[in-house]
Amino acid sequence: MGASGSKKLSKHSRGLRERLLRARGDGYGKQRDASGGEYSQFQEESGREQNSPSCEGQQYQQGEYMNSPWRNPATERQKDLYRQQNMDDVDSDDDDLIGVPVTPRVPRREMTYKLAIDMSHFIKEKGGLQGMFYSRRRHRILDIYLEKEEGIIPDWQNYTHGPGVRYPMYFGWLWKLVSVELSQEAEEDEANCLVHPAQTSRHDDEHGETLVWQFDSMLAYNYKAFTLYPEEFGHKSGLPEKEWKAKLKARGIPYSE
């Protein structure tokens, strides 16, 4: 993308971050990954990603994004304000929630490998998804935002079935979903905020897992979804129909006859 494109993205990114913040609330204590390791807000993982080999997208100027509780420590008052804002947004209409035009600003287009990588790095630079709890509502926010602001047809954001790590099925999208367990501290802190995605994520997921987005630069080179779970691609897998259907059935994944 050229300079003009990056300016356009920088301007409109603020809208996406604000809407995600409103649906997010704030960071809550520590999380535990599926293996039992404890960490806070994925900050350590985020730092490692900076030094890992990657298919770098467009570089963006730092300091353009608003302060957020997962980048800067929030005061107790800020935490309370974020929580209340999240509560107030629960019954909001999607159009009001997203704050984007009814029709796309640019011609509609399909997602491409390069576009997926550029969008992934752009969102990472703005801190928009890292360590954020996944929910169907946030899934919609991301779909609708990219459709209205970038013209991207919302048929690309799919993840492997699970349980465990959910890999993006669109090659080039560098955000996977990782299963985490909330610490006791976080569970108690969220007891009075049951509509927060940390609580609703497990209900959205058929495996009952709490999921967060995590950036993985190696997904630009390694098509993990297809390598590990080709049966989820059905006829596109290259497997005999009988074989991929049998694998889906064994994993309890429904499919159309």
Curated annotation (Swiss-Prot):
Region annotation Acidic: where it falls in the sequence: 88-96
Which stretches are tagged as biased composition: Polar residues? 38-65
Gene3D superfamilies linked to this entry:
Nef Regulatory Factor
Q: Which portions of the chain have biased composition (kind: Basic and acidic residues)?
A: 15-35
Q: Where is this region: Disordered?
A: 1-72
Q: Which domain of life does this protein belong to?
A: Viruses
InterPro entries the UniProt entry points to: HIV-1_Nef_core_sf, HIV_Nef
Q: Which GO terms describe its cellular component?
A: host cell plasma membrane; membrane
Cellular localisation:
Host cell membrane
Q: Which GO terms describe its molecular function?
A: GTP binding
Q: Which UniProt keywords apply?
A: AIDS, Host cell membrane, Host membrane, Host-virus interaction, Lipoprotein, Membrane, Myristate, Viral immunoevasion, Virulence
Motif PxxP in this chain: 104-107
Q: How does it sit in the membrane?
A: Lipid-anchor
Quote the Pfam families the UniProt record gives.
F-protein (PF00469)
Mediates dimerization: region residues: 140-156
Name the principal localization, coarsely classed. Answer: host cell
* Residue positions of covalent lipid attachment, annotated as N-myristoyl glycine: 2
- Miscellaneous: This isolate is from a German AIDS patient (with predominantly neurological complications) who was probably infected in Mali.
Q: Which family does it belong to?
A: Belongs to the lentivirus primate group Nef protein family.
Note what the entry says on domains.
Answer: The N-terminal domain is composed of the N-myristoyl glycine and of a cluster of positively charged amino acids. It is required for inner plasma membrane targeting of Nef and virion incorporation, and thereby for infectivity.
Cited function = Factor of infectivity and pathogenicity, required for optimal virus replication. Alters numerous pathways of T-lymphocyte function and down-regulates immunity surface molecules in order to evade host defense and increase viral infectivity. Alters the functionality of other immunity cells, like dendritic cells, monocytes/macrophages and NK cells. One of the earliest and most abundantly expressed viral proteins. In infected CD4(+) T-lymphocytes, down-regulates cell surface expression of CD4, CD28, CD3, and MHC-I or MHC-II molecules.
What do we know about how this protein assembles, alone or with others?
Homodimer. Interacts with host CD247/TCRZ; this interaction induces down-regulation of cell surface TCR/CD3 complexes.
Q: What is this protein called?
A: Protein Nef
Native organism is Human immunodeficiency virus type 2 subtype A (isolate BEN) (HIV-2)
Q: Which gene encodes it?
A: nef
